[in-house]
């Protein structure tokens, strides 16, 4: 450190010192930070963290952290008040990033909406949090699981599947979302 990385919006971001406190405004980035083993560095997480089963099983302490909102209603002031060394947000918050930076926050945007994007997010977050070895292990585990799954279903007819949305059974993942790759 200082370390310059390129986030998933193509922005060059310089992280001046190794981040010791993180804020994640996106459940996918929060989940990846757990997988990278840096959940203890989180000081703020996305809304509804207290309802996520994954967190209750893998990092229950996250359920009591302050909420920094959602991609639709991000709490800029609340996030800034936590003084995180690094903030991770979904790419859809790109219009809010300049304001966050004006508030003195270092911000990375992630867009893990397909397999390449997921691996890019893992690599970006692993690099930013100095956990590249763990990031490589995580990618290899995912690749291994996907290969085993492909082998297990080889030669079978793929069924039509409707994946109900998180908020409503009448909503589903669009073509640009990771879930559509399943």
Protein language model regions, located:
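N-terminal hydrophobic or amphipathic helices and topogenic motifs
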Residues: 1-16
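Residues at the C-termini of beta-strands that transition into short coil/loop
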Residues: 9, 46, 69-71, 111, ...
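Extracytoplasmic substrate-binding proteins
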Residues: 12, 96-173
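Extracellular/periplasmic catalytic domains that process cell-envelope and extracellular macromolecules
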Residues: 15-17, 37, 60-61, 80-81, ...
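Short periplasmic/luminal acceptor-recognition loop of GT-C membrane glycosyltransferases, typified by
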Residues: 21-25, 161
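A short, structured surface patch at a secondary-structure boundary
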Residues: 24-82, 86-92
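Short, surface-exposed amphipathic charged segments that create phosphate/polyanion-binding patches used
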Residues: 58-59, 122-126, 178
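Alpha-helical, coiled-coil/dimerization segments enriched in small aliphatic residues
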Residues: 172-182
């Amino acid at each position: 450190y200082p370390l310059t990385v390129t986030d998933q919006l193509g922005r060059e971001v310089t992280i001046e010192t190794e981040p010791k406190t993180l804020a994640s405004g996106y459940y996918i980035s929060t989940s990846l930070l757990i997988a990278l083993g840096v959940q203890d560095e989180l000081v703020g997480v996305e809304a509804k963290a207290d309802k996520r089963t994954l967190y209750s099983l893998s990092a229950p302490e996250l359920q009591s952290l302050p909420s920094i909102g959602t991609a639709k209603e991000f709490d800029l002031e609340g996030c800034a008040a936590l003084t995180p060394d690094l903030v991770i947000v979904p790419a859809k918050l790109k219009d809010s990033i300049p304001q966050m930076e004006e508030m003195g926050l270092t911000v990375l945007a992630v867009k893990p909406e397909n397999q390449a994007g997921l691996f890019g997010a893992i690599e970006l977050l692993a690099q930013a949090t100095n956990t590249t070895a763990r990031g490589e292990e995580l990618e290899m585990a995912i690749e291994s699981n996907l290969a085993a799954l492909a082998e297990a279903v080889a030669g079978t007819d793929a069924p039509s599947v409707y994946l109900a949305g998180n908020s409503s059974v009448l909503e589903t993942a669009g073509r640009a979302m990771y879930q559509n790759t399943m």
